[in-house]
């Protein structure tokens, strides 16, 4: 992984597998693919740099504006600036605090970053709500449909189901360990009535759920037949979205 020159940050973003043998993909392709075919994770080939002045200029901006400035350099030409701004606006419209991730001062030396103002009260809403909108626009433009499969111990599953419920072009199946998530999380996953989201209780623990998901991704014939995608932390788009609040709180 190298560091990109500023003038190249928007045009030549490519994503490579950590294991080095999977095809090189664009941001959009890497996002829709999830786990690389060689078993690695997709990461940017080059890392765009933000200067001190650019970071300093974020002071006082809204969370949405900061999100745009932090993430846009990693997208290449996947979305126009206007498209991405609209995506960000839709993603965070349902948060219950104007600041989205307010930094609260407790005393002279202690601050608390509140990450519970999303629709499921989990910090993972910050990434899932954005990924849902990114997936929907990408799939609509491509005329494609994907099947998202994930494993959860609670908060990932509820955040994913909330983000993708009712969206076109996506079916979501979340595996969770039976009797090992909180009642609130179970209800968040199992009560949405939209036909494209499904919560599946597995007799076992989280590792058993994760093993089943990995088996599906490693079965290339099955993976291709249902166009499998993932939104667990294997997906770079999720990691990128969750980096924004470090800038907003700085």
Language-model segment annotations:
Residues 2-250:
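PLP-dependent amino-acid enzyme catalytic core
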